[in-house]
Amino acid sequence: MSIILGIDPGSRVTGYGVIRQNGRHLQYLGSGCIRTSEKDLPGRLKQIYAGVTEIITQFQPDVFAIEQVFMAKNADSALKLGQARGAAIVSAVNHDLPVYEYAARLIKQAVVGTGGADKAQVQHMVQHMLKLPAKPQADAADALGVAICHANTNKTLIALAGQATSAKRGRYR
């Protein structure tokens, strides 16, 4: 049994989702968004770090999973996204959590069944898979998708290994 924290990073809105994996069963524990209010990027990064730290303290996850940087429409957006990811990852590493990264297409594949799924499809499937009474916010649904992707990837690796061992830890550990 493990608690997985999934993060969908963003410099303005960072989604988070927390699930408990017990064998094949996934249980929803919580989700939401860290909304930054600072105008300058360093202030927003500080808010992301503090928000992720608060979530880690509240839920005590065993694993931290985050979406990889995708190629944004412009370099400035990609850099800001990378910095937001960095703030979240530093919080995880400071709490001695193993860090795993997943590409957006792999996350969508794990949740919806196709890497080209849109946000509405991800929201619908996350609601269905976790038996939620309502659709989660888009960024929170994406973060729950990251956590679900890790849970499914971890289950597959355990099955392939033929024993109950964890997947290789991320490079940030």
UniProtKB/Swiss-Prot annotation:
Binding site for Mg(2+) 2: E67
Superkingdom of origin: Bacteria
Entry's localization field: Cytoplasm
Essential cofactor(s): Mg(2+)
UniProt-annotated catalytic positions: D8, E67, D139
SUPFAM superfamilies in UniProt: Ribonuclease H-like (SSF53098)
Main location: cytoplasm
UniProt key word Protein biosynthesis: no
UniProt-recorded name of the protein: Crossover junction endodeoxyribonuclease RuvC
Organism: Vibrio vulnificus (strain YJ016)
